[in-house]
Amino acid sequence: MTQGHKKIIAENRKARHDYFIEDTYEAGLVLKGTEVKSLRLGKANLKDAYAKITNGEVFVHQVHIGVYPFAYYDNHNPLRVRKLLLNKREIKKLYGKVNEKGYSLVPLRMYFINGKAKLTLAVAKGKRKYDKRESIRRREEKRDLDRQRKNYK
């Protein structure tokens, strides 16, 4: 990861519930001016977001960046497709992983580092319903153990 002050704008908490995270990458975003200003106000949502590789480039879809309230006619489309900036080597690696059955690219969080907007992209495999139940059961068991340890002392 890059050094510097990190200000988190948005986080996709549901992704860790719906997917097994295999690997993560940090990517830059190609944005318009009003999008950057909206991000500085914290108006972003990664809930239904996903990424696709098209013609050797990575694009992120369904990332909602709210309109900038002080821009008049020059505002952006909140759900427009945005290009991600990755190295050619990283794109080839991602392409190889995503072509395997069950893998997809999921954005985990969006943040600023040294004034530049970045996105953490994960190679993830979808969980089935019983996997989700299993992780919920493990979390509850861990919580019960922690509670018992606390009460024991």
Predicted regions and their residues:
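Helix-adjacent hinge/juxtasegments
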Residues: 52-94
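Intrinsically disordered, Lys/Arg-rich N-terminal extensions and targeting peptides
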Residues: 1-32, 136-153
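Short solvent-exposed loop/turn micro-motifs enriched in small/polar/acidic residues
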Residues: 22, 43-44, 77, 101-104
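N-terminal first-folded block
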Residues: 16-47, 51-59, 63
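C-terminal end-helix/capping segment
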Residues: 79, 86-92, 126-153
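Beta-rich strand-turn-strand
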Residues: 86-122, 126-128
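Broad gene-expression machinery/nucleic-acid interaction feature
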Residues: 26, 31, 46-48, 81, ...
